[in-house]
Amino acid sequence: MKSKLPETGTQGKFSKEYAFARALKDGQVRMHHMTDEAVQDPEIRRWMEKIKVFHNSELEVASNQYAEETGPHAERMLVRLKSGRVLTEEEIFILGMARRPLAFEDVRFKYKDCGSVAGLPPEDIDTIISLATGLEQLNDLTLLLQHLSSERKPSWTK
């Protein structure tokens, strides 16, 4: 379901062009950027048209030699400036994969971001994080399960 120039938020989730354009504009890509409206942002659409994504078998070989790295392949980004200068950045091990796991604060941030878009109240998100962080010390999972199986419907199901 990869989409070079996505039209919908769902397509945007699978578009490197969209992710790169959004990160360049906003410094990061968050869940609220995965809406139809955000993908249709005229400035983002202009940036996406300038972004070219190419398959690089050299990086794929480097990435695939590690069995546990079954997720996204290594990436190399080249940015050509108007001056002609080229900036390059390369990552063999994608952040969040086994060899470059997220720090706990990054996991917490991602969960809060996803939970807020899903319509969970901030206090419930904090309670779930707190309970999950101390999971090994819990004698009873009832409270955690109650928060995880709330009667509230996530915003995307309305």
Model-derived regions: residue spans:
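Terminal-appendage/accessory-domain detector
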Residues: M1-K158
